[in-house]
């Protein structure tokens, strides 16, 4: 079983170069459902480098921060490293609402003890203000998150409904 798992992880990691943002989004969406999904997402994003596009760097940061949840040691280091990846991506593209969504979702789900919650209102505003200028595919992804999020009010959720 371990051999099959290792082989699976190898192929996932190897195929990252050919992966689309849509495939990464799907993996990110299910990563929070289980430890195994988180580990798969973390492995998938390991090939992302500082030379990749900012959105991939943001997802890499998210994978590191999510992986910290299951780490026995180095939790602080993983959280710090993940945050650096996300913030660096946002510094490169501050108006990218998908990067804003990644940061918002992390801040929404991290325990209150982790000091990474101060940008939620700012990110919500950028997401809501720019929602209709995005592609239909990205709008659907954003809408799915917003409808399930506790950070958005019922009025804000209505605002982006079809």
What are these regions (language model features)?
Residues 30-44, 75-83, 116-117:
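Helix-turn-helix repeat elements of alpha-solenoid scaffolds
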Residues 127-162:
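Terminal, low-structured helical/coil segments at or just beyond the last alpha-helical repeat
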Residues 18-42, 48, 57-59:
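N-terminal leader/linker segments that initiate helical-solenoid repeat arrays
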Residues 31-32, 66-75, 109-114:
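Short coil/turn linking the two alpha-helices of tandem helical-hairpin repeats
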